[in-house]
Amino acid sequence: MELAFGDLKDRATLRSAVAGVDMVYHIAASFRTEHLPRNDMWRTNVQGTQDLLEVSHEAGVQRFVHCSSVGVHGAIEGPPGTEGSPFDPGDSYQRTKAEAEKLASDFGTEHGLPIVIFRPAGIYGPDDLRFLKLFKSVKSGVFRMIGSGEVLYQMIYVEDLVDGVLLCGTSERAPGEVFILTGVRPHTLNTIAQTIAKTQGVELSSFRIPATPVYVAGALCELVCRPLGINPPLYRRRVDFFRKPRAFSIEKAQKVLGFSPKVDLAEGLQLTATWYEEQGLL
């Protein structure tokens, strides 16, 4: 396997990247940042996917594995969610991922290019910094749970995700299918926070903050910060982490791909904490 660097806005670099390649794993995307105009996110996540599909087909690529996101489903009412759960994207990133996924599926059908789509859940582990703020706030003692903490959230350790993605590229039964890739089971936010606290040898505060006023505060922060191109210190999507359930079944990936996550929550969070510490981040 070869890691290719390029620009999804530059077809010439894409052609160079796929030349002589049998299989493409498309994992590049623009993520959530306030300074990024929404049309730029669409240009990267949707048009960039279209361009990569076209040059891959022209180059004779035999399989195209596309990274989507469980975020296309939004909150999961009556969990667990499955690959067939309705789409309900909640922001620009999720909407572009949903559009790109449909585009990839339709392109495969129209042009005969074998497409495999995977939707990862919350990815954590070495080299991922999205959960660093949570670790820091727990370690420093300033963390306060927003809401009850009983909302379900499902995560996947990065090495387990890599195993699942490789199976998407090698399984004979994968083409034409969509797979949710996440850990074996969801956990409450209380459990996740308590497990992080154990990695740091600290006790969590039992004090909780009501979710509704924090959500309103997030909306106000967005109203003030977004016109200025500033990342809000608090925004509704962050509060939604504490409010909306995201729990999924991986039964399809287990049965079709033989997917079997190996790293449980306690081990994965400890490995993540150790990496943060080794990098001087925590």
Where are these regions (language model features)?
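Mid/C-terminal beta-alpha module of Rossmann-like enzyme folds, strongest
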Residues: L167-L234, I250, A266, Q270-L271, ...
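NAD(P)H-binding glycine-rich loop region in Rossmannoid oxidoreductase-like domains
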Residues: M1, F5-Q47, V55, V70-A75
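Short alpha-helix in the Rossmann-fold core of NAD(P)-dependent oxidoreductases
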Residues: T44-T49, V65-S68, T96-K97, Q154
